[in-house]
UniProtKB/Swiss-Prot annotation:
Gene: sfsB
InterPro entries: Lambda_DNA-bd_dom_sf, Ner_HTH_dom
DNA-binding region: 50-69
Protein name stated in the entry: Sugar fermentation stimulation protein B
GO MF annotation list: DNA binding
NCBIfam families: PRK10344.1 (NF007670)
UniProt source species: Escherichia coli (strain K12)
Pfam families: HTH_35
Length: 92
């Protein structure tokens, strides 16, 4: 059965960040990560990275990646924020 939930294309995510005046690398560094780390969220599920990207775009992660937040058996959305490890921003 095919899912009706279509994720944003990675190029659309990158373009959205550019329109907001930022980039994947800049958001990675802003959140205390290596400059290329955040790009992992484009190709595989990573709740923390998805949240960082969504916040930078001014939306929610389930809007960008509905397939990652939808349970096909119960047809409900999953709260994946519970899967995130706690994270404290480094002091500058």
């Amino acid at each position: 059965m095919e899912s009706n939930f279509i994720d944003w294309h990675p190029a659309d995510i990158i373009a959205g960040l550019r329109k907001k005046g930022t980039s994947m690398a800049a958001e990675s560094r802003r959140n205390g990560l290596s400059s290329s780390t955040l790009a992992n969220a484009l190709s595989r599920p990573w709740p923390k990275g998805e949240m960082i990207i969504a916040k930078a775009l001014g939306t929610d992660p389930w809007v960008i990646w509905p397939s990652r937040y939808h349970d096909p058996q119960t047809h409900e959305f999953i709260d994946r924020t519970q899967l995130m490890r706690s994270y404290t921003k480094p002091k500058k």
